Design a protein with these regions (language model features):
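Extracytosolic ligand-binding ectodomains
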Residues: 1-228
Length: 228
């Protein structure tokens, strides 16, 4: 099953691509339930329809606030499918009032996991925690990469302070479509003419603290990166 926000380009775009790929691979989508920004305060109807359809996995291409509502509602009704989301769900453990134990087994695709043991990630996490007192999620990592990729594009194309906005824009477009960038959210990243970035996704799953020999991104849960 799928629950998505039809009023949001991010959510509806992923839904459309997922639906096409599922059909190509012969996977059955037993139900696809939509909501909009105007009626997202109560998603019990969408959850109930997935449950009635017998969906064993529910794909959630949505943001963490709405995802927390769905997991809470499913728990109240005894519905226990596998929930799988995307990078917009990163941050669900920080939703005020959300019972984080409900995130056990939740899987999502995200370009960044704060538990990663590479030197670049750990240096960023340490500096971020020292500055802001909390663990960064993928939104923070994306913002970091935006700034430093732009910096690289500026250096490689020779942008100067005396250029006007349109000149700088054209230079940056040239830079992004011709360079390769190594950042927190991926290595060897490239951009096409439309601005779409190419990088490998990471699939992670929330594990209870102590359930695996893993560093914990945010107790009581760990981010366990799953191999592709």
């Amino acid at each position: 099953g799928i629950i998505y926000d039809s009023s949001d380009a991010y959510s509806s775009g992923i839904y459309a691509k997922f639906k096409t790929e599922a059909e190509t691979k012969g996977l059955e989508i037993v139900t696809a339930e939509a909501f909009t920004s105007d009626n997202k305060s109560d998603l019990s109807t969408q959850v109930a329809k997935c449950q009635e359809a017998g969906a064993e996995l529910v794909f959630l291409p949505i943001y963490y606030t709405e995802a927390s509502q769905i997991l809470t509602t499913a728990n109240k009704t005894g519905y226990e499918p596998i929930f799988f989301g995307c990078d917009g769900m990163d941050g669900i453990l920080d939703v005020e009032g959300f019972d984080t134990s409900l995130a056990e087994g939740l899987m999502l695709l995200t370009p960044f996991a704060a538990d990663a043991q590479d030197e670049k990630t750990q240096a960023f996490v340490s500096a971020y925690v020292a500055a802001y007192g909390e663990t960064p999620n993928q939104f923070a990592a994306d913002a970091y990469d935006v700034i430093y990729s732009m910096y690289q594009a500026v250096l490689e194309t020779g942008v100067t302070g005396d250029m006007d906005a349109s000149e700088i824009c054209e230079q940056l477009k040239t830079g992004y479509t011709s360079m390769t960038f190594d950042g927190l959210t991926g290595t060897g990243m490239t951009w096409d003419a439309s601005g779409a970035v190419s990088k490998d996704p990471k699939a992670i799953e929330f594990w209870p603290m102590g359930a695996a020999d893993l560093p914990c991104q945010q107790p009581p849960f760990c981010y366990a990166q799953r191999k592709k």
